[in-house]
């Protein structure tokens, strides 16, 4: 009897430690350069649903000021009107920045795929497109490359970004356009949320938002084959309000109030506005999920839409996670953090990519293995 009990206990420990060893076998590092390169594939990918990270040869992005990297490096003088405070730091943008040493998805992919093209680099004066205020000829292709994001961008203006992206992409050899595998980060909605608190305009409804997303994705599907789109959810932008009580943010409130007046209105009106913003975020996330489900039910070998929740809990973030230009946009510190979270999620099943994102110090960077694939399946 005792022998049988001992055997069962021993078996339990063997299974437990074996499972633990398997779970811990995945390598996480502090710097992407510490990850070993992958051996070349023996056979080419069967479709966009069979991609290793080193199969990606083109990186692209559509979005707003966050993707443009506005204010990420912080202000350069103690006066708000310093011209450098109006710069987009595109080279450190979490999704597509290509500055040497920057912690970005683009640079992580380039570690495995050195011939990657499309990363944005450097800094330049803000490119503004906000509703009807959308001047032409702002793009700087030598720095922007395939980062089509513009500060202030709303879903109703997405065709402007898409036209720029198509124009730049089709300057490449047709081999690149038609056959190379591409990865596009699509992140939009924050400015729509910031504008909707007191404006029930038809072009800000969740239904119209969904239509804008789908029409944009349809053009991408038709015009940019062999593309995986990572469609990000929206987060509760209203959370930034609480940071403006911090000493770090004093003196810059007027800038943020201009950027998102709904979030910073005082008193009962401010409370109601922020509630409306959060409700809009929920509606928009449902719309985003509807779009993702649509493409999951219309599966294609040359086009896929992934879904990445962006449910960040800003109350867990250090105040330095916001840019000291306006205490509204993410700083390089937050760009780095989000990069690691989204990178680590790329090969995970959909059921493990969601959940509340809380701040962690020293997040490790996942090293991809030869059997890892970018997980395009949106269902658990």
Segments predicted by a language model, with ranges:
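Short amphipathic alpha-helices and their capping/turn segments at secondary-structure boundaries
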Residues: 42-60, 162-179, 217-222
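Hydrophobic transmembrane alpha-helices of multi-pass solute transporters/permeases
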Residues: 53-73, 79, 99-101, 108, ...
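Cell-envelope and extracellular/periplasmic
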Residues: 66, 72, 112, 147-153, ...
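Structural recognition of the beta-strand scaffold that forms the well-ordered cores
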Residues: 58-71, 118-119, 144-149, 182-187, ...
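Conserved SGNH/GDSL esterase-like catalytic core that processes O-acyl groups on lipids
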Residues: 77-212, 218
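Conserved catalytic region of serine esterases and O-acyltransferases that act on ester linkages
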Residues: 1-57, 61, 249, 258-380
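Short, solvent-exposed loop/turn and secondary-structure capping segments
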Residues: 70-75, 121, 158-159, 195-200, ...
